[in-house]
Amino acid sequence: MECPAPDATDAADPGEAGPYKGSEEPEGREPDGVRFDRERARRLWEAVSGAQPAGREEVEHMIQKNQCLFTSTQCKVCCAMLISESQKLAHYQSKKHANKVKRYLAIHGMETIKGDVKRLDSDQKSSRSKDKNHCCPICNMTFSSPAVAQSHYLGKTHAKSLKLKQQSTKGAALQQNREMLDPDKFCSLCHSTFNDPAMAQQHYMGKRHRKQETKLKLMAHYGRLADPAVSDLPAGKGYPCKTCKIVLNSIEQYQAHVSGFKHKNQSPKTLVTLGSQTPVQTQPTPKDSSTVQD
């Protein structure tokens, strides 16, 4: 469709796109000579799905990717003539243009894109099956047909390679377990791994490990060594009291809490005397079960 240049009376104000002479082209109709294929739908969707173009470079990039619809002098979607550089920039950055492009895409492009998305999902599922019928990554073999592939997967060669791979995986897991038991490679207290003994020694002399050791000794002193939450809690994450369901931020806070009246009256517990270290069972006094941090 050829669109005449605007008359002097039709020229737009600065910053506005000049309209075609006459009414705008109906939105449901594609511009003449434009075939709306999948690739064009994708490019146009990318152009309007994000933020509006800001600045000359983004506008030029949008025009370059969608030359079938946008040029420096004409917007076929809005049926507008752009008679100056300022009008071109103002038009392509306007909300009115963006809204018309979205409506245009909804009419001509969304069905195309939706169809592509559905096909992509089914294609991905079928491609895995096709890949399996084309090659075996375990045995590093390729097949000329699905029948040859099926014969391979049922054969002794594939079964042997699969068994070796499984054994290798198990061996790697056992090696990892052995490394976790080696203090020069893994610290079970801090859940840290080391590449060499020097790195391990540096860790064991560091503040983080010492803090975890102090935490563990403190819990043991107050009869909390059997609490799994203590050893599972990462270093630097506080000092938990499962009885009161709170976490203290420092050793001093924890000591003050477990020595306090509120903690002692939550449930029966063991008090350790400083002289004999003999545990003595005490019974709680009647108290509200609500938990309040000291």
UniProtKB/Swiss-Prot annotation:
Start-end of Matrin-type zinc fingers: 70-104, 131-165, 182-216, 236-270
Modified residues (N-acetylmethionine): M1
Tissue specificity statement from the Swiss-Prot or TrEMBL entry: Expressed in all tissues tested, including heart, brain, spleen, lung, liver, muscle, kidney and testis. Exogenous expression induced apoptosis.
Keywords (A to Z) from UniProt: Acetylation, Cytoplasm, Isopeptide bond, Metal-binding, Nucleus, Repeat, RNA-binding, Ubl conjugation, Zinc, Zinc-finger
MF (Gene Ontology): double-stranded RNA binding; miRNA binding; zinc ion binding
Residues reported to bind Zn(2+) 1: C75, C78, H91, H97
Binding site for Zn(2+) 2: C136, C139, H152, H158
GO biological process, one term: positive regulation of apoptotic process
Keyword Cell cycle attributed: no
Comp. bias regions, Low complexity: 1-19
GO cellular component: cytoplasm; nucleolus; nucleus
Subunit organization: Forms a heteromeric complex with XPO5 and ILF3. Found in a nuclear export complex with XPO5, RAN, ILF3, ZNF346 and double-stranded RNA. Interacts with XPO5. Interacts with ILF3 in an RNA-independent manner.
Chain's role: Binds with low affinity to dsDNA and ssRNA, and with high affinity to dsRNA, with no detectable sequence specificity. May bind to specific miRNA hairpins.
Comment, domains: The zinc-finger domains are required for binding to dsRNA, and also for nuclear localization.
Name of this protein: Zinc finger protein 346
Species per Swiss-Prot/TrEMBL record: Mus musculus
Gene expressing this chain: Znf346
